[in-house]
Amino acid sequence: MAVKASGRFVPPSAFAAGTGKMFTGAYAWNAPREAVGRERPLTRDEMRQMQGVLSTINRLPYFLRSLFTSRYDYIRRNKSPVHGFYFLTSTFQRRLWPRIERVNQRHEMNTDASLLFLAERDHYARLPGMNDKELKKFAARISSQLFMMYEELSDAWVDAHGEKESLFTDEAQAHLYGHVAGAARAFNISPLYWKKYRKGQMTTRQAYSAIARLFNDEWWTHQLKGQRMRWHETLLIAVGEVNKDRSPYASKHAIRDVRARRQANLEFLKSCDLENRETGERIDLISKVMGSISNPEIRRMELMNTIAGIERYAAAEGDVGMFITLTAPSKYHPTRQVGKGESKTVQLNHGWNDEAFNPKDAQRYLCHIWSLMRTAFKDNDLQVYGLRVVEPHHDGTPHWHMMLFCNPRQRNQIIEIMRRYALKEDGDERGAARNRFQAKHLNQGGAAGYIAKYISKNIDGYALDGQLDNDTGRPLKDTAAAVTAWASTWRIPQFKTVGLPTMGAYRELRKLPRGVSIADEFDERVEAARAAADSGDFALYISAQGGANVPRDCQTVRVARSPSDEVNEYEEEVERVVGIYAPHLGARHIHITRTTDWRIVPKVPVVEPLTLKSGIAAPRSPVNNCGKLTGGDTSLPAPTPSEHAAAVLNLVDDGVIEWNEPEVVRALRGALKYDMRTPNRQQRNGSPLKPHEIAPSARLTRSERLQITRIRVDLAQNGIRPQRWELEALARGATVNYDGKKFTYPVADEWPGFSTVMEWT
């Protein structure tokens, strides 16, 4: 019998909250597995598109090509060919390739300046991936073509004016310089004295110095290496290899390159001495370098002492401090950060793609707006002084931290001027008011501690244990190497004083004997500056120099310089620091602080005492006074084959042994093999029937290349314009006959045994 419900139902059971874990069953084999299915193959159009992108990648320099091909192979192997296709078409072709193209366009040959090197355009485009050997050959081709151009222009000028003497005028040299230097500008360089040439102020002496550089292979090598390094780094910035997630501040390649160059420089310094030109006294060069501000520890201590002195001087004058931060617009930043706190992620900034600015461009922008600010300060009779620190963002874009002091009544006006110029360009973009300019008031006594972290971070990471970097989240102590590599790569000075007396005079005053007054030689004002520098009190030094914002000509003490007796390889006088002088007492009243003339020379190799190595033999007499050494750690140095042969010859001369003994023959044969120069493959004789003799190298040595410049000047003074092969022959020691007059120049014989004396008519 059915039971009728009276309108009441049992409610369902409560819903069980999920645990968040997928049901796996009672046993491990009950866990769900991936669905079995075939991966979608690439279509014919996709394959064709993928091959085109891979062909584009294959034309990139190796350091970029290997980066993308390895990433593509990893995705294709661990995911699927479809995912690899999406990486090539979406990530590379759509997002990265336009940035790479824009960087290459900014660095390509400037054909608007000259079409002389149009044939080298493709070769110049390979500069970021060029090795040193190929780069040196490229530099030699550039200098030789410019030399040929100069010769042709000189001949044309003589034909037009009729006399060779007309070449040695300002007008002629300016004409030649304009064509040669204009052609060199195709390689994105600024030749020396180019601005003076554009203003019509070029002299013969200046033209010669500038043109001599353009003919120098080593000068071009140095220029091209700098361009290669910056081009290489900009490409890595463009593809996102320089940021807090990859390598902050500088790429891994730049850090390794700077470390290798510094290690090579250190090894060179260890291999050299400082020699007194008069007495021949020698001291270790590396010890002097490590005792100067080249030592990061000493540099940091000097900067901290400078900051403390500035703060004490400001407190004595009643000035107030400001901590200013200046940042470039967003278009100078290759990346941007999205999110907050630990969830921040780095994304490419597509606003950067239009211009592809590098850190050097951002530094120029900051210097430009700072010059506008200083002009506004001068127009409104405002004065500031302090210290500027330049450091990079995580993506390599520089920003400035400035510790400035001023009169309390001028502070608001100064801040408003700086804010106006900081936001003058793209000031309406999102976040500009908050990020582009920041000004904080400094409490008395807190300035040094506030900026000390930035100084240590940019030098050696001293006393930063346990502190994290705001940009990268990494320990500040570990970022110092990357920051210094960034500054070295982009040639950006990290520290600069503002409105303060010169640091050069401060360092020269500290070279004077401690506690020895110079008031009798100068006056009490100069003595006060010396005493302040001697005690390391930078605040008193500022006061003794006349205070902050005093023009250099009005300062109490300045650095004295004089031309050196020697000229450089471009026949230019080189000024060197010799001491100090007081402008108010006359520029000729100089106190010499550098009384000794030193030069850098290689270390003298340590010659071990001659020891003839032999076994213990039977004594010639009943008493053997030359027993075998026993005990101790003393070890006799092994003689070279030449030293061993010399000792054997002495024994032969004394009649102890005979010429025909086997030991003598072996010793002399070993010495001959040891002293024989090993020829390289190009110098070996290919004929098996002829003896293998060493031929001198056909390349010019460094001393011969330097001699060519001096020979050209000497012959030009005699009205002679030699050809290139004649200059090379004269540099090698040949005698050349010009119209019955013989010319020859001394040269070091770097290939003994081969005559370098020739005569050409």
Swiss-Prot record:
Keywords: Covalent protein-DNA linkage, DNA replication, Early protein, Endonuclease, Hydrolase, Nuclease, Viral DNA replication. The keyword Hydrolase applies. The active site is at residues 450, 454. GO terms for molecular function: endonuclease activity. Pfam families: Phage_GPA. The keyword Hydrolase applies. It comes from the Viruses. It is an enzyme of class 3 (hydrolase). One of its GO terms (biological process) is viral DNA genome replication. Its EC number is 3.1.-.-. Endonuclease which induces a single-strand cut at or near ori. May act by forming a covalent link to the 5'side of the nick. Belongs to the phage GPA family. This is Replication gene A protein. The lineage of its organism: Viruses, Duplodnaviria, Heunggongvirae, Uroviricota, Caudoviricetes.
